[in-house]
């Protein structure tokens, strides 16, 4: 999987360390699914909040001692079944700070996915399937 930090996150980190601007950690982080991948500066096209879609909470992360600039999700993430219609082909995902589709700020994004979610299809990320890198 490829991907990157969003410009929003990079700016927040710089402001925090260089200007003493406090960034308040969100209560939860959410993973969303995209039919057009976001980039560092664009939002992409997220699956809309219809047909059973809702971003999923992903608050548990593991940091590696050998690669401390990376974090991975620690548990299975399962989206509800797509019903009554499918969501299309999922090509990317993103971690954001808000629950609603298209809301909040993208913090990190990842591409390299290619999964068609048809009627009653379910999207999942196994534990350790999402790797975020601070580079």
PLM region spans:
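Small cysteine-rich, disulfide-bonded extracellular modules of the LU/uPAR three-finger superfamily
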Residues: 1-93, 97-135
